[in-house]
């Protein structure tokens, strides 16, 4: 038997005859909804009307007593919220909710975690926190339905990732990620730049690269073009300074992307939580630490497909591949000459800069005069009065060099150097881009070899040459080398008497059988004069000055070789008289 619509709201006699029913009938005996008249004892689909009015998605359970349309349910009225907060005036239906709410004002946290002691204002928050210690799952996972799993990508555990790389064993959530990753092993770059032809393994990397051609504006889709003729290759367009709007305020380096700037600024701002366990060096990113560890392990995972050579960095392999393909993406805007490396292009562009005239022709040449002897053994240079001829009155601290009115004034820096090779050698005229290269080159003329081998005493003009020489002594050392601290930080101040270990030299060196030991590196010498000359390599003392240019030397023979360069450049008949014969001055008190 089917129930009529009216039977849906039938109630017991107690409910029908109750006082609340009579009160509602007195309040609203009849309701008019459209063309239909509804009464409380005969409401049809009343809950549907109520749900549609409230905008709810599902039907709510019916009240035992039919309500008038528009009357709020019990607990939904403003008069039912008797618990009011005295701080902010917010009302609550239950007193327990008010107590929890007031803890947000007082800061009270009575629920403590038994593991770490952290406090919480609500017991449910403490329960959620304790799951971080126990590893308990908050929700039970239903058994999966038959068929392939349909879990969100971000919630797939690492152990359930179906795609694994056969080269390195790395796992991925999707097969497309595996395909992108395998290109790092194969070197495949299917995404080509339509402007310069550079390839990329990922389309997003190509998009970022294309911004370097037109700043932040992405180029329009490029139709596949024909290959340019090999006779006249077009020079690719390189990014300019105005195409890199993001500038680092610490070092001035420019970037095309803001994310690249933020990544770069980590090296300045810190912190650097990734530390190397081998050498203690710290890095801001974990990827930088991984690259650095290959220096210690010797791992070279990036192999060249042409010759099989390995590289520790992918960028180094990219540069190496250009030697096989002949690709030169870095072009000079002046002469259209292209280079495979950007650093080579920067050095080449210096050749287009006009050098400025900078020489010592504006300064007078001082006649050759002997330099005063250095302080005797056992005295400090700071206590010995300087000779007036060696006062630092002239520019650059050189003796006797007074600028002419047209030259640079006192206290002003010298004119800036410009050009490809601004640092010229006064001996042979050879130019160098860096002053450090000029200093190394000068040792060819002077014969200076300040880098000595602690094993055999052999001298070298370059520190790298000494490092190579030290490898020949590996395995054939007769005595342990001195500790590094003695080589880097001398025990004695410059000019003081070296401390000779008493265990090696008993008493004062009075006979030929005694050895004179260097207090800096422990090297032994049969004569005290050799020890004095050797000490100058540590203290930097250069008592022999050139009268032409004011350059100092630690050995008189080195100064003689240097002065021959000045005489060779000066023809006979020029000057006050014939050139004087060069004699070696032996400082008094040293030998």
Curated annotation (Swiss-Prot):
Residues bearing PTM Phosphoserine: 12
Coiled coil residues, start to end: none
Domain of life: Eukaryota
Listed Gene3D superfamilies: Classic Zinc Finger
Location of the region described as Disordered in the Swiss-Prot/TrEMBL record: 1-24, 55-80, 131-160, 206-241, 372-429, 464-512, 564-591
InterPro entries: Znf_C2H2_sf, Znf_C2H2_type
Keyword list, A-Z: Acetylation, DNA-binding, Isopeptide bond, Metal-binding, Nucleus, Phosphoprotein, Repeat, Transcription, Transcription regulation, Ubl conjugation, Zinc, Zinc-finger
GO MF annotations in UniProt: DNA binding; identical protein binding; zinc ion binding
Positions of disulphide bridges: none
This protein's record includes keyword Nucleotide-binding: no
UniProt keyword Cell wall biogenesis/degradation, yes or no: no
Residue stretches of biased makeup (Low complexity): 224-235, 379-404
A GO cellular component entry from the record: nucleus
Family from the record: Belongs to the krueppel C2H2-type zinc-finger protein family.
Function comment: May be involved in transcriptional regulation.
This protein's name: Zinc finger protein 48
């Amino acid at each position: 038997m089917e129930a009529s619509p009216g039977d849906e709201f039938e109630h017991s006699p107690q409910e029908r005859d109750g006082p609340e029913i009579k009160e509602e009938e007195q309040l609203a005996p009849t309701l008019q909804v459209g063309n239909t008249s509804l009464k409380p004892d005969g409401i049809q689909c009343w809950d549907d009307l109520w749900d549609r009015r409230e905008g709810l998605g599902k039907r709510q359970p019916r009240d035992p007593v039919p309500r008038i349309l528009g009357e709020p349910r019990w607990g939904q009225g403003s008069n039912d919220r008797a618990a009011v907060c005295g701080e902010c005036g917010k009302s609550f239906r239950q007193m327990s909710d008010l107590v929890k709410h007031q803890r947000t004002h007082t800061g009270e946290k009575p629920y403590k975690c038994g593991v770490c002691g952290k406090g919480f204002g609500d017991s449910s928050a403490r329960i959620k926190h304790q799951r971080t210690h126990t590893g308990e799952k908050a929700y039970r996972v239903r058994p999966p339905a038959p068929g392939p799993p349909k879990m969100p990508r971000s919630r797939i555990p690492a152990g359930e990732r179906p795609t694994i790389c056969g080269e390195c064993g790395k796992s991925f959530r999707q097969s497309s990620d595996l395909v992108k990753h395998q290109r790092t092993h194969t070197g495949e770059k299917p995404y080509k730049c339509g402007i310069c032809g550079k390839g990329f393994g990922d389309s997003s990397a190509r998009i970022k690269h294309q911004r370097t051609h037109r700043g932040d504006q992405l180029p329009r889709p490029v139709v596949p073009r024909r290959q340019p003729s090999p006779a006249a290759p077009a020079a690719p367009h390189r990014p300019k300074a105005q195409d890199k709007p993001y500038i680092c305020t610490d070092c001035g380096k420019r970037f095309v992307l803001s994310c690249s700037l933020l990544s770069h600024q980590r090296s300045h701002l810190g912190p650097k939580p990734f530390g190397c366990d081998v050498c203690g060096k710290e890095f801001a990113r974990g990827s930088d630490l991984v690259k650095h560890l290959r220096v210690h392990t010797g791992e070279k995972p990036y192999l060249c497909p042409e010759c099989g050579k390995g590289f520790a960095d992918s960028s180094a392999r990219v540069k190496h591949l250009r030697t096989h393909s002949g690709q030169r993406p870095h072009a000079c805007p002046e002469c259209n000459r292209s280079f495979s490396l950007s650093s080579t292009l920067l050095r080449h562009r210096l050749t287009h800069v006009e050098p400025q005239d900078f020489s010592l022709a504006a300064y007078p040449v001082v006649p050759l005069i002997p330099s005063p002897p250095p302080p005797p053994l056992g005295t400090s240079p700071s206590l010995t009065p300087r000779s007036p001829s060696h006062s630092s009155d002239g520019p650059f601290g050189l003796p006797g060099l007074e600028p002419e009115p047209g030259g640079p004034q006192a206290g002003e820096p010298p004119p800036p150097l410009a050009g490809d090779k601004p640092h010229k050698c006064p001996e042979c005229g050879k130019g160098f881009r860096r002053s450090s290269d000029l200093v190394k080159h000068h040792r060819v003329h002077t014969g200076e070899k300040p880098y000595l081998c602690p094993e055999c005493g052999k001298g070298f003009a370059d520190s790298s040459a000494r490092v190579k020489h030290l490898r020949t002594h590996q395995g054939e050392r007769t005595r342990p080398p001195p500790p590094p601290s003695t080589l880097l930080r001398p025990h004695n101040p410059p000019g003081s008497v070296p401390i000779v270990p008493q265990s090696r030299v008993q008493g004062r060196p009075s006979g030929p059988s005694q050895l004179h030991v260097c207090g800096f590196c422990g090297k032994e010498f049969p004569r005290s004069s050799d020890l004095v000359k050797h000490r100058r390599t540590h203290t930097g003392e250069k008592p022999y000055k050139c009268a032409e240019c004011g350059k100092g030397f630690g050995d008189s023979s080195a100064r003689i070789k240097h002065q021959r360069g000045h005489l060779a450049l000066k023809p006979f008949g020029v000057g006050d008289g014939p050139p004087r014969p060069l004699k070696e001055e032996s400082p008094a008190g040293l030998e």
